[in-house]
């Protein structure tokens, strides 16, 4: 597959590992709070984890609410943890908030750059491909990640939901990035881990939607669009 004129990259769980596989992270954290939760064995911890994660999924399933709360993840997490504990009969909101804040801090401390991220982006740039970083989320949080992992100077255009005013999968987001790169949709790839945001929406504009699937989750059962390509490593883009 020949290289395009431009590549738009997602940030979270594409260039950096940020929020993937939350099950293991929640289990680790809930063990720390086991005594406060009166959860004294693995089965009790699992009940709390399931309740918290199911409430989080329900919380984020509302597209309009998600667009609002993506700009304030810590508060959103507090609300969903409160709901998860309340479902189990625990209405201690102060405890729920401490758990949510601890999870936010733990995830922040565990952000990692994918090992082939810099090399892949640099190889594309060296090949003359124009590059944009297009990410949802709050400006301050995303800018901190970009600086922390030395990504800023590697892109011709950086577009953050909290600064631009709209986030993926709004088509205006991709159109604006393409305009800034002065490239037509048919000459561009969108690369990322979110099926709706990096495959379905970009393909509506005529872009190639390249799905990054490092954990081999497979195409979602409900998918109505097929990825232009599936990669398990970023380096596959330039191999």
Q: Model-derived features: where do they sit?
A:
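A metal-dependent, Asp-based hydrolase signature
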Residues: 50-102
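Residues in soluble alpha-helical coiled-coils and helical-bundle/repeat scaffolds
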Residues: 16-20, 90, 108, 112, ...
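Hydrophobic alpha-helical bundle segments that form small-molecule/ligand-binding pockets
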Residues: 37, 85-91, 124-126
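Asp-based, Mg2+/Mn2+-dependent phosphohydrolase catalytic module
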Residues: 1-7, 19-20, 35, 43, ...
């Amino acid at each position: 597959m020949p290289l395009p004129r431009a590549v738009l990259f997602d940030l979270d769980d594409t260039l950096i590992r940020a929020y993937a596989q939350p099950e293991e992270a929640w289990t680790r954290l809930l063990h720390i709070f086991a005594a406060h939760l009166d959860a004294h064995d693995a089965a009790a911890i699992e009940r709390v984890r399931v309740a918290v994660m199911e409430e989080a999924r329900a919380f984020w399933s509302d597209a309009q609410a998600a667009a609002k709360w993506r700009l304030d993840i810590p508060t959103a997490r507090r609300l969903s943890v409160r709901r998860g504990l309340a479902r189990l009969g625990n209405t201690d909101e102060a405890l729920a908030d401490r758990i949510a804040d601890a999870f936010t801090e733990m995830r922040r401390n565990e952000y990692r750059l994918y090992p082939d991220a810099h090399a892949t982006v640099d190889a594309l740039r060296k090949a003359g491909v124009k590059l944009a970083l297009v990410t949802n989320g709050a400006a301050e949080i995303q800018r901190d990640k970009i600086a922390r992992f030395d990504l800023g100077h590697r892109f011709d255009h950086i577009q953050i939901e909290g600064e631009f005013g709209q986030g993926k999968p709004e088509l205006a987001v991709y159109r604006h990035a393409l305009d800034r790169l002065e490239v037509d949709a048919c000459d561009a790839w969108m690369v990322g881990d979110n099926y709706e945001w990096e495959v379905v929406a970009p393909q509506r504009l005529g872009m190639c939607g390249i799905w990054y699937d490092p954990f081999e989750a497979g195409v979602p059962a409900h998918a109505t669009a097929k990825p232009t390509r599936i990669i398990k490593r970023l380096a596959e883009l330039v191999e």
